[in-house]
C-alpha cells in the first residue's frame, strides 16, 4: 500500500527521465492533481527526483486548477508544474535536462518561472512580446485579478508590424546595427500606441523612431 510506495521512493531514480516526466505530467492534469501531489509529497515519493517541489506550493496548484475550471482553461501540465516550483529565472534550463523536456516545454517553463508578474496595464502588449500562450498562462498563475486580462486575450493574434528594415533604410539610415535599433524603437512605440495601422499614425511613430 502507501507504506510500500514510500519505502520504494528511491526506486524512481532507476526510471528513465522520460518515464518520470510522462507519469508526472499525466498526474498533473488529473481532476484531483493537487490532492495526489500532496499525498506523494507526504510519502516522500517526489523527493528523490524533484526535491524542489514542497508541500507549501500544493495550494498554488489547487488554486490554479480551480481557476482553470472557472475560466474555462484546459488543464495544462507545464503550467501546473510551474505552479509547484519556486519562482526564479531559468526553470526551463534547470528542469529541461532533468526531465528531458521538449524545446517548446523548456521555453515555456523558462517564461513561467520568472518572478510573479504584476497585472499588466495592457495585456495585448504583454502578449505581443511574450506570446499569447505565455501571457495567458502567467495571468492564470497570477490570480483571480487577472481574469479580465485573460479574457481580453482570447483569440488574440499577434499583429504584423507595418514597418520593416527597408523602410528605415529608405529614410536614409545606413544598413547595419542602427537599422535594428531604430526598428526596435519603432516597435516599442507602435505596440505602446495600440498597434495602429493607419498611415498617418504609423508615419508619426516612424518619425519619432528616427529622431
Model-predicted segments: where are they?
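Residue-level recognition of alpha-helical structural elements
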Residues: 1, 124-125, 175, 198
Amino acid at each position: 500500500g502507501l507504506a510500500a510506495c514510500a519505502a520504494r521512493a528511491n526506486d524512481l531514480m532507476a526510471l528513465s527521465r522520460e518515464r518520470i516526466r510522462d507519469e508526472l505530467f499525466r498526474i498533473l492534469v488529473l481532476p484531483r492533481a493537487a490532492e495526489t501531489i500532496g499525498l506523494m509529497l507526504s510519502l516522500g515519493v517526489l523527493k528523490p527526483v524533484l526535491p524542489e517541489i514542497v508541500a507549501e506550493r500544493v495550494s498554488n496548484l489547487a488554486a490554479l486548477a480551480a481557476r482553470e475550471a472557472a475560466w474555462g482553461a484546459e488543464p495544462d501540465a507545464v503550467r501546473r508544474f510551474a505552479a509547484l516550483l519556486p519562482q526564479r529565472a531559468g526553470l526551463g534550463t534547470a528542469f529541461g535536462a532533468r526531465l528531458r523536456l521538449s524545446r517548446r516545454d523548456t521555453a515555456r517553463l523558462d517564461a513561467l518561472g520568472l518572478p510573479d508578474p504584476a497585472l499588466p496595464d495592457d495585456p495585448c502588449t504583454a502578449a505581443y512580446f511574450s506570446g499569447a500562450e505565455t501571457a495567458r498562462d502567467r495571468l492564470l498563475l497570477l490570480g483571480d485579478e487577472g481574469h479580465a486580462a485573460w479574457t481580453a486575450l482570447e483569440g488574440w493574434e499577434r499583429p504584423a508590424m507595418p514597418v520593416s528594415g527597408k523602410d528605415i533604410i529608405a529614410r536614409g539610415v545606413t544598413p547595419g546595427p542602427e537599422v535594428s535599433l531604430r526598428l526596435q524603437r519603432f516597435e516599442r512605440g507602435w505596440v505602446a500606441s495600440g498597434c495602429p495601422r493607419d498611415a498617418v499614425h504609423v508615419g508619426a511613430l516612424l518619425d519619432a523612431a528616427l529622431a
